[in-house]
Design a protein with these regions (language model features):
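Short secondary-structure boundary segments
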Residues: 170, 261, 346-347
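Short, intrinsically disordered, charge-biased short linear motifs at domain edges
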Residues: 282-291
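ATP-binding/phosphotransfer module of carbohydrate and carboxylate kinases, centering on a glycine-rich
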Residues: 1-85, 92-95, 100-134, 138-156, ...
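Glycine-rich phosphate-binding loop and adjoining helix at the ATP-binding site
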Residues: 129, 136-225, 249-255, 356-366
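Conserved phosphate-binding catalytic cores of ATP/NTP-utilizing and phosphoryl-transfer enzymes
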Residues: 87-108, 207-233, 237-256
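Short glycine-aspartate micro-motif
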Residues: 108-112, 163-167, 256-260, 266-268, ...
Protein backbone atom coordinates (compact mmCIF):
# COMPACT_ATOMS: atom_id res chain seq x y z
CA UNK A 1 0.00 0.00 0.00
CA UNK A 2 2.91 2.35 0.58
CA UNK A 3 3.35 2.95 -3.11
CA UNK A 4 0.01 4.78 -3.33
CA UNK A 5 1.13 7.61 -1.06
CA UNK A 6 3.48 9.17 -3.59
CA UNK A 7 0.82 9.09 -6.31
CA UNK A 8 -1.65 10.76 -3.98
CA UNK A 9 0.89 13.42 -3.10
CA UNK A 10 1.21 12.94 0.66
CA UNK A 11 4.50 11.07 0.93
CA UNK A 12 6.53 14.16 1.78
CA UNK A 13 3.98 16.25 3.66
CA UNK A 14 5.83 18.16 6.33
CA UNK A 15 3.02 20.16 7.85
CA UNK A 16 3.29 23.43 9.68
CA UNK A 17 3.31 24.28 13.38
CA UNK A 18 -0.08 23.89 14.94
CA UNK A 19 -1.78 21.87 12.26
CA UNK A 20 -3.78 18.91 13.46
CA UNK A 21 -7.07 17.55 14.61
CA UNK A 22 -7.78 19.84 17.50
CA UNK A 23 -6.15 23.00 16.22
CA UNK A 24 -9.03 24.46 14.26
CA UNK A 25 -6.63 25.18 11.39
CA UNK A 26 -8.34 25.79 8.08
CA UNK A 27 -7.38 24.01 4.92
CA UNK A 28 -6.53 25.88 1.73
CA UNK A 29 -8.56 25.27 -1.41
CA UNK A 30 -5.67 25.48 -3.88
CA UNK A 31 -4.54 22.61 -6.12
CA UNK A 32 -0.92 23.20 -5.16
CA UNK A 33 -1.78 22.48 -1.53
CA UNK A 34 -3.78 19.31 -2.13
CA UNK A 35 -1.24 17.37 -0.07
CA UNK A 36 -1.67 19.75 2.85
CA UNK A 37 -5.44 19.38 2.75
CA UNK A 38 -5.19 15.61 2.47
CA UNK A 39 -2.96 15.56 5.53
CA UNK A 40 -5.52 17.57 7.51
CA UNK A 41 -8.26 15.10 6.60
CA UNK A 42 -6.07 12.07 7.21
CA UNK A 43 -5.09 13.36 10.64
CA UNK A 44 -8.73 13.85 11.62
CA UNK A 45 -9.47 10.29 10.51
CA UNK A 46 -6.55 9.11 12.65
CA UNK A 47 -7.65 10.95 15.78
CA UNK A 48 -11.30 9.91 15.31
CA UNK A 49 -10.29 6.28 15.85
CA UNK A 50 -12.51 3.32 15.10
CA UNK A 51 -15.69 5.38 15.67
CA UNK A 52 -14.92 7.37 12.55
CA UNK A 53 -15.95 10.84 11.43
CA UNK A 54 -18.43 12.09 8.82
CA UNK A 55 -17.60 14.13 5.75
CA UNK A 56 -19.60 17.05 7.12
CA UNK A 57 -17.58 17.00 10.33
CA UNK A 58 -14.38 16.86 8.29
CA UNK A 59 -15.46 19.95 6.36
CA UNK A 60 -16.36 21.80 9.56
CA UNK A 61 -13.08 20.92 11.27
CA UNK A 62 -10.80 21.73 8.33
CA UNK A 63 -12.62 24.69 6.79
CA UNK A 64 -12.61 22.91 3.44
CA UNK A 65 -15.72 22.85 1.26
CA UNK A 66 -17.84 19.67 1.36
CA UNK A 67 -16.94 19.14 -2.29
CA UNK A 68 -13.21 19.29 -1.54
CA UNK A 69 -13.63 16.87 1.36
CA UNK A 70 -15.56 14.45 -0.85
CA UNK A 71 -12.78 14.47 -3.45
CA UNK A 72 -10.07 13.94 -0.85
CA UNK A 73 -11.90 11.13 0.93
CA UNK A 74 -12.63 9.45 -2.41
CA UNK A 75 -8.90 9.40 -3.14
CA UNK A 76 -8.15 8.12 0.35
CA UNK A 77 -10.64 5.30 -0.10
CA UNK A 78 -9.29 4.46 -3.54
CA UNK A 79 -5.79 4.26 -2.09
CA UNK A 80 -7.00 2.00 0.72
CA UNK A 81 -6.23 4.55 3.45
CA UNK A 82 -9.84 5.11 4.50
CA UNK A 83 -13.00 3.04 4.60
CA UNK A 84 -16.61 3.36 5.72
CA UNK A 85 -17.23 2.79 9.42
CA UNK A 86 -21.02 2.65 9.37
CA UNK A 87 -23.70 5.32 9.64
CA UNK A 88 -24.47 7.81 12.37
CA UNK A 89 -27.79 9.44 13.18
CA UNK A 90 -28.00 13.16 12.41
CA UNK A 91 -30.41 15.89 13.41
CA UNK A 92 -33.00 16.72 10.81
CA UNK A 93 -31.71 14.53 8.03
CA UNK A 94 -30.74 11.09 6.90
CA UNK A 95 -28.00 9.22 8.78
CA UNK A 96 -24.48 10.25 7.82
CA UNK A 97 -21.86 7.81 6.59
CA UNK A 98 -18.75 7.94 8.75
CA UNK A 99 -15.24 7.13 7.61
CA UNK A 100 -12.23 5.80 9.48
CA UNK A 101 -8.53 5.36 8.85
CA UNK A 102 -7.33 1.90 7.80
CA UNK A 103 -4.39 1.36 10.20
CA UNK A 104 -2.95 -1.61 8.34
CA UNK A 105 -2.77 0.32 5.06
CA UNK A 106 0.78 1.39 5.83
CA UNK A 107 3.63 0.75 8.24
CA UNK A 108 6.88 2.30 9.39
CA UNK A 109 9.87 0.91 11.26
CA UNK A 110 11.25 2.62 14.34
CA UNK A 111 14.84 1.67 15.20
CA UNK A 112 16.47 2.69 18.48
CA UNK A 113 20.24 2.21 18.53
CA UNK A 114 21.30 2.61 22.15
CA UNK A 115 24.89 2.22 23.26
CA UNK A 116 24.37 -1.41 24.25
CA UNK A 117 20.96 -2.46 22.91
CA UNK A 118 18.89 -2.34 19.72
CA UNK A 119 15.10 -2.05 19.72
CA UNK A 120 13.11 -2.24 16.48
CA UNK A 121 9.34 -1.83 16.19
CA UNK A 122 6.94 -2.07 13.27
CA UNK A 123 4.07 0.41 13.64
CA UNK A 124 0.85 0.80 11.67
CA UNK A 125 -0.54 4.17 10.57
CA UNK A 126 -1.95 4.89 14.03
CA UNK A 127 1.46 4.34 15.61
CA UNK A 128 0.41 1.08 17.24
CA UNK A 129 3.20 -1.49 17.52
CA UNK A 130 2.42 -4.66 15.56
CA UNK A 131 5.85 -6.34 15.83
CA UNK A 132 9.00 -5.83 17.89
CA UNK A 133 12.57 -7.12 18.08
CA UNK A 134 15.38 -6.56 20.60
CA UNK A 135 19.03 -7.50 20.42
CA UNK A 136 22.29 -6.70 22.21
CA UNK A 137 24.33 -3.97 20.52
CA UNK A 138 27.83 -2.60 20.86
CA UNK A 139 27.80 0.90 19.42
CA UNK A 140 31.58 0.89 19.62
CA UNK A 141 31.95 -2.20 17.41
CA UNK A 142 32.37 -0.04 14.33
CA UNK A 143 29.92 1.61 11.98
CA UNK A 144 29.85 -1.14 9.36
CA UNK A 145 29.21 -3.87 11.93
CA UNK A 146 26.41 -1.87 13.54
CA UNK A 147 24.77 -1.10 10.20
CA UNK A 148 24.94 -4.75 9.17
CA UNK A 149 23.43 -5.93 12.45
CA UNK A 150 20.72 -3.26 12.40
CA UNK A 151 19.79 -4.07 8.80
CA UNK A 152 19.48 -7.73 9.69
CA UNK A 153 17.14 -7.01 12.58
CA UNK A 154 14.97 -4.71 10.47
CA UNK A 155 14.74 -7.29 7.68
CA UNK A 156 13.70 -9.96 10.17
CA UNK A 157 11.12 -7.60 11.65
CA UNK A 158 9.52 -6.83 8.30
CA UNK A 159 8.91 -10.43 7.22
CA UNK A 160 7.55 -9.42 3.84
CA UNK A 161 5.92 -6.11 4.85
CA UNK A 162 6.81 -3.15 2.61
CA UNK A 163 7.04 -0.11 4.92
CA UNK A 164 7.14 3.61 4.25
CA UNK A 165 10.68 3.60 5.56
CA UNK A 166 12.83 3.38 8.66
CA UNK A 167 13.22 6.01 11.36
CA UNK A 168 16.50 5.65 13.27
CA UNK A 169 17.10 7.19 16.69
CA UNK A 170 20.42 7.13 18.52
CA UNK A 171 22.53 9.31 20.82
CA UNK A 172 23.74 12.61 19.38
CA UNK A 173 25.18 14.88 18.36
CA UNK A 174 24.22 14.41 14.72
CA UNK A 175 22.86 16.21 11.67
CA UNK A 176 19.19 15.31 11.26
CA UNK A 177 18.93 16.84 7.78
CA UNK A 178 21.89 14.96 6.31
CA UNK A 179 21.66 11.84 8.47
CA UNK A 180 25.32 12.19 9.43
CA UNK A 181 26.66 11.52 12.93
CA UNK A 182 29.08 13.74 14.83
CA UNK A 183 31.25 12.88 17.85
CA UNK A 184 28.91 10.69 19.91
CA UNK A 185 30.15 10.84 23.50
CA UNK A 186 32.33 7.80 24.10
CA UNK A 187 32.27 6.76 20.43
CA UNK A 188 34.38 9.27 18.45
CA UNK A 189 34.78 6.79 15.58
CA UNK A 190 31.24 7.64 14.43
CA UNK A 191 32.18 11.26 13.66
CA UNK A 192 31.22 12.05 10.06
CA UNK A 193 29.59 8.68 9.33
CA UNK A 194 26.64 8.96 6.90
CA UNK A 195 24.32 6.56 8.73
CA UNK A 196 21.21 7.44 6.74
CA UNK A 197 22.79 6.69 3.38
CA UNK A 198 24.54 3.56 4.61
CA UNK A 199 21.39 2.02 6.08
CA UNK A 200 19.20 3.12 3.16
CA UNK A 201 21.63 1.50 0.75
CA UNK A 202 21.64 -1.72 2.75
CA UNK A 203 17.84 -1.93 3.11
CA UNK A 204 16.65 -0.28 -0.09
CA UNK A 205 14.23 1.85 1.94
CA UNK A 206 13.92 5.55 2.84
CA UNK A 207 15.69 6.27 6.14
CA UNK A 208 15.39 9.25 8.50
CA UNK A 209 17.91 9.74 11.33
CA UNK A 210 17.41 11.78 14.50
CA UNK A 211 18.60 11.95 18.07
CA UNK A 212 16.97 9.50 20.46
CA UNK A 213 15.62 12.32 22.62
CA UNK A 214 14.06 14.15 19.66
CA UNK A 215 12.39 10.96 18.48
CA UNK A 216 10.94 10.26 21.91
CA UNK A 217 9.68 13.85 22.19
CA UNK A 218 8.08 13.60 18.74
CA UNK A 219 6.37 10.36 19.74
CA UNK A 220 4.84 12.06 22.76
CA UNK A 221 3.89 15.18 20.83
CA UNK A 222 1.94 13.40 18.10
CA UNK A 223 0.53 10.63 20.29
CA UNK A 224 -2.65 10.42 22.29
CA UNK A 225 -1.42 8.33 25.20
CA UNK A 226 -0.98 9.75 28.68
CA UNK A 227 2.21 9.58 30.72
CA UNK A 228 2.36 7.44 33.85
CA UNK A 229 0.74 9.06 36.84
CA UNK A 230 -1.42 11.40 34.77
CA UNK A 231 -5.10 11.94 35.29
CA UNK A 232 -6.52 10.75 32.01
CA UNK A 233 -5.78 8.92 28.83
CA UNK A 234 -8.31 10.82 26.78
CA UNK A 235 -5.86 12.94 24.86
CA UNK A 236 -2.56 14.74 24.84
CA UNK A 237 -3.39 17.90 26.81
CA UNK A 238 -5.81 16.36 29.29
CA UNK A 239 -3.62 13.29 29.62
CA UNK A 240 -1.00 15.28 31.46
CA UNK A 241 -3.33 16.30 34.24
CA UNK A 242 -3.58 19.85 32.86
CA UNK A 243 -6.87 21.62 32.42
CA UNK A 244 -8.43 21.42 29.01
CA UNK A 245 -8.01 25.14 28.48
CA UNK A 246 -4.28 25.11 28.98
CA UNK A 247 -3.55 24.91 25.28
CA UNK A 248 -0.96 22.25 25.95
CA UNK A 249 -0.23 19.75 23.25
CA UNK A 250 1.41 19.47 19.86
CA UNK A 251 -1.41 21.15 17.99
CA UNK A 252 -2.27 23.51 20.83
CA UNK A 253 1.16 25.10 21.01
CA UNK A 254 2.31 23.71 24.36
CA UNK A 255 5.95 23.18 25.32
CA UNK A 256 7.72 20.43 27.23
CA UNK A 257 11.14 18.95 27.85
CA UNK A 258 11.72 15.21 27.61
CA UNK A 259 14.75 14.22 29.74
CA UNK A 260 16.21 10.81 28.86
CA UNK A 261 18.43 9.11 31.44
CA UNK A 262 19.83 5.75 30.43
CA UNK A 263 23.37 4.98 29.34
CA UNK A 264 23.68 8.75 28.81
CA UNK A 265 21.62 11.88 29.44
CA UNK A 266 19.96 14.14 26.90
CA UNK A 267 16.83 16.16 26.22
CA UNK A 268 14.21 16.49 23.52
CA UNK A 269 12.43 19.85 23.37
CA UNK A 270 8.95 20.60 22.07
CA UNK A 271 8.50 24.37 21.91
CA UNK A 272 5.25 25.92 20.76
CA UNK A 273 3.98 22.51 19.71
CA UNK A 274 6.89 21.45 17.47
CA UNK A 275 10.12 19.56 18.05
CA UNK A 276 12.94 22.08 18.39
CA UNK A 277 16.10 20.68 16.83
CA UNK A 278 18.00 23.88 16.16
CA UNK A 279 19.70 24.87 12.91
CA UNK A 280 22.31 22.10 13.27
CA UNK A 281 20.30 19.55 15.32
CA UNK A 282 22.29 20.82 18.30
CA UNK A 283 19.38 21.60 20.60
CA UNK A 284 18.86 19.27 23.55
CA UNK A 285 22.50 18.46 24.40
CA UNK A 286 21.28 18.74 27.95
CA UNK A 287 23.68 16.29 29.59
CA UNK A 288 26.74 18.37 28.86
CA UNK A 289 25.80 21.62 30.54
CA UNK A 290 28.33 22.25 33.31
CA UNK A 291 26.92 22.78 36.79
CA UNK A 292 30.08 22.07 38.84
CA UNK A 293 33.24 23.76 37.53
CA UNK A 294 35.60 21.56 39.54
CA UNK A 295 33.51 18.41 39.11
CA UNK A 296 34.56 15.01 37.75
CA UNK A 297 35.83 14.70 34.19
CA UNK A 298 33.16 13.82 31.64
CA UNK A 299 33.83 11.74 28.51
CA UNK A 300 33.03 14.86 26.47
CA UNK A 301 36.15 16.55 27.91
CA UNK A 302 34.42 18.99 30.26
CA UNK A 303 34.21 18.78 34.03
CA UNK A 304 31.08 18.75 36.11
CA UNK A 305 28.55 17.99 33.36
CA UNK A 306 25.09 16.99 34.51
CA UNK A 307 25.54 13.64 32.77
CA UNK A 308 28.69 12.58 34.62
CA UNK A 309 27.35 13.83 37.97
CA UNK A 310 24.02 12.07 37.49
CA UNK A 311 25.46 8.78 36.22
CA UNK A 312 28.09 8.75 38.99
CA UNK A 313 25.34 9.10 41.58
CA UNK A 314 23.32 6.31 39.94
CA UNK A 315 26.42 4.10 39.93
CA UNK A 316 26.87 4.66 43.67
CA UNK A 317 23.23 3.84 44.30
CA UNK A 318 22.44 7.34 45.62
CA UNK A 319 19.27 7.85 43.61
CA UNK A 320 18.16 10.86 45.64
CA UNK A 321 21.35 12.68 44.64
CA UNK A 322 20.94 11.65 41.00
CA UNK A 323 17.37 12.96 40.99
CA UNK A 324 18.50 16.19 42.64
CA UNK A 325 21.17 16.74 39.96
CA UNK A 326 18.65 15.98 37.23
CA UNK A 327 16.25 18.38 38.89
CA UNK A 328 18.86 21.15 38.86
CA UNK A 329 19.20 20.74 35.11
CA UNK A 330 15.42 20.61 34.67
CA UNK A 331 15.10 23.83 36.68
CA UNK A 332 17.58 25.50 34.32
CA UNK A 333 15.42 24.49 31.35
CA UNK A 334 12.25 25.71 33.03
CA UNK A 335 13.85 29.07 33.75
CA UNK A 336 15.34 29.40 30.28
CA UNK A 337 12.43 28.19 28.14
CA UNK A 338 9.32 28.64 30.35
CA UNK A 339 8.11 25.14 29.47
CA UNK A 340 4.80 23.68 30.63
CA UNK A 341 5.92 20.20 31.59
CA UNK A 342 8.95 18.02 32.31
CA UNK A 343 8.80 14.39 31.13
CA UNK A 344 11.27 11.76 32.30
CA UNK A 345 12.27 8.66 30.35
CA UNK A 346 15.06 6.16 29.75
CA UNK A 347 15.90 2.84 31.36
CA UNK A 348 17.34 4.35 34.56
CA UNK A 349 14.19 6.36 35.15
CA UNK A 350 12.04 3.34 34.26
CA UNK A 351 13.74 1.31 36.99
CA UNK A 352 13.19 4.02 39.62
CA UNK A 353 10.22 6.08 38.46
CA UNK A 354 8.95 7.19 41.86
CA UNK A 355 12.36 8.33 43.09
CA UNK A 356 13.09 10.43 40.02
CA UNK A 357 9.65 12.00 39.71
CA UNK A 358 9.70 12.89 43.40
CA UNK A 359 13.28 14.17 43.40
CA UNK A 360 13.05 16.26 40.23
CA UNK A 361 9.65 17.54 41.31
CA UNK A 362 11.03 18.66 44.67
CA UNK A 363 13.67 20.83 42.97
CA UNK A 364 11.05 22.45 40.74
CA UNK A 365 8.75 23.00 43.71
CA UNK A 366 11.55 24.76 45.59
CA UNK A 367 12.21 26.94 42.56
CA UNK A 368 8.53 27.90 42.34
CA UNK A 369 8.45 28.81 46.04
CA UNK A 370 11.51 31.03 45.71
CA UNK A 371 10.12 32.87 42.74
CA UNK A 372 6.54 33.07 43.98
CA UNK A 373 5.25 32.60 40.47
CA UNK A 374 2.50 30.09 41.19
CA UNK A 375 2.37 26.32 40.85
CA UNK A 376 5.56 24.45 39.93
CA UNK A 377 5.98 22.92 36.50
CA UNK A 378 4.68 19.33 36.75
CA UNK A 379 6.94 16.31 36.35
CA UNK A 380 5.66 13.07 34.77
CA UNK A 381 7.06 9.82 33.40
CA UNK A 382 6.89 9.79 29.61
CA UNK A 383 4.66 7.21 27.89
CA UNK A 384 6.09 4.38 25.84
CA UNK A 385 8.29 2.74 28.44
CA UNK A 386 11.32 0.88 27.15
CA UNK A 387 10.27 1.23 23.52
CA UNK A 388 9.26 4.92 23.65
CA UNK A 389 12.28 6.01 21.62
CA UNK A 390 11.70 3.33 18.98
CA UNK A 391 8.03 4.26 18.67
CA UNK A 392 9.02 7.90 18.30
CA UNK A 393 11.50 6.91 15.60
CA UNK A 394 8.65 5.37 13.60
CA UNK A 395 6.86 8.72 13.84
CA UNK A 396 9.72 10.29 11.89
CA UNK A 397 8.07 8.57 8.89
CA UNK A 398 4.43 8.56 10.01
CA UNK A 399 3.93 12.06 11.41
CA UNK A 400 4.55 13.93 8.12
CA UNK A 401 1.74 11.94 6.48
CA UNK A 402 -0.63 13.64 8.90
CA UNK A 403 0.86 17.11 8.59
CA UNK A 404 2.72 16.81 11.86
CA UNK A 405 6.20 16.42 13.19
CA UNK A 406 8.37 19.00 11.47
CA UNK A 407 9.84 21.91 13.38
Amino acid sequence: MAGNYGAFGIQGVSGSPGTGAGAGVSGVNLPALRSHNAALVLDLLRTAGAAGISRLELAERTGLTPQAVSKITARLRADGLATEAGRRASTGGKPRTVLRLVPEAGHAVGLHLDRDELTAVLCDLTGAVVAERRAPLDLGAGAEAVVEGAAGEVSALLAGVSPLGVGVALPGPLDHTLGVLHRVTGFPEWDGFALRDALAGRLGLPVVVDKDTNAAALGVAVGTGAPSGSDSGSGFGSGFGLDSGSGFGFAGGGSFAYLHLGTGLGAGLVIGGVVHRGARTGAGEFGHQVIQLDGPLCECGNRGCIEVLCLDAVGRGTLAEAARVLGAGAANLVGLLDIDLVLLGGRTVAAHEEEFVRGVGAVLEERARREGGGAPVPVRVAPGGARGVAEGAAQLLLAPLFGRGEG
